[in-house]
């Protein structure tokens, strides 16, 4: 059985934890392992932070959109912004690359996403924003949403 959730919120840094906890609560019905849940929460944090800091460049008027689809033991996340987009996507996906070197922990977001998720697709258009599609196959889900 398929179950879906959609969420949107202002591009404020304090909403990053809200997004992480909300997505985790929704995914909990699949009974993921603690490691899987932690990885998904981390990926949500990274993608939302990228949207806020890089996509909207701190402009709180922007909106971050999250869609979560649960099917059997599969979690599909889509995190989207309508910000400035990514100028050079290949370069941005390189470990330690950042356009904001003054920020702590910069340059690891895409690397973390690629290590924790089974599939990562990034679509970005300058001036139109970025959409990140992420898929995770849970190892031993007792899918409660059936």
From Swiss-Prot:
A Pfam family assignment: HATPase_c_2
Record bears the keyword NAD: no
The record's GO molecular-function terms, alphabetically, read: ATP binding; protein serine kinase activity; protein serine/threonine kinase activity; sigma factor antagonist activity
Q: Where is the signal peptide?
A: none
Q: Mind telling me which InterPro entries this protein's record contains?
A: Anti-sigma-factor_SerPK (IPR050267), Anti-sigma_F (IPR010194), HATPase_C_sf (IPR036890)
Enzyme Commission identifier(s): 2.7.11.1
BP GO annotations: asexual sporulation; negative regulation of sporulation resulting in formation of a cellular spore; sporulation resulting in formation of a cellular spore
Keywords on this record?
A: ATP-binding, Kinase, Nucleotide-binding, Serine/threonine-protein kinase, Sporulation, Transferase
Q: Where are the transmembrane segments?
A: none
What is catalysed by this protein?
Answer: L-seryl-[protein] + ATP = O-phospho-L-seryl-[protein] + ADP + H(+); L-threonyl-[protein] + ATP = O-phospho-L-threonyl-[protein] + ADP + H(+)
Question: Its biological function?
Answer: Binds to sigma F and blocks its ability to form an RNA polymerase holoenzyme (E-sigma F). Phosphorylates SpoIIAA on a serine residue. This phosphorylation may enable SpoIIAA to act as an anti-anti-sigma factor that counteracts SpoIIAB and thus releases sigma F from inhibition.
Which family is it part of? Belongs to the anti-sigma-factor family.
HAMAP family reported for this sequence: Anti_sigma_F (MF_00637)
Q: Which NCBIfam families match?
A: spIIAB
The protein's name is Anti-sigma F factor
The species this protein was found in: Bacillus cereus (strain B4264)
Name of the coding gene:
spoIIAB
């Amino acid at each position: 059985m398929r179950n879906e959730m959609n969420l949107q919120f202002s591009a404020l840094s304090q909403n990053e934890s809200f997004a992480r906890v909300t997505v985790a609560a929704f995914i909990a019905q699949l009974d993921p392992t603690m490691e899987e849940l932690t990885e998904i929460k981390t990926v949500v944090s990274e993608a939302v932070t990228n949207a806020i800091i890089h996509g909207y460049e701190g402009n709180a008027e922007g909106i971050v959109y999250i869609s979560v689809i649960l099917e059997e033991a599969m979690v599909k996340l889509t995190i989207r912004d309508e910000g400035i987009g990514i100028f050079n996507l290949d370069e941005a996906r390189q470990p330690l690359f950042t356009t904001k070197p003054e920020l702590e922990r910069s340059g690891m977001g895409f690397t973390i996403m690629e290590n924790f998720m089974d599939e990562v697709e990034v679509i970005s258009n300058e001036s139109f924003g970025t959409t990140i599609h992420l898929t995770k196959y849970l190892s031993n889900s007792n899918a409660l949403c059936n």
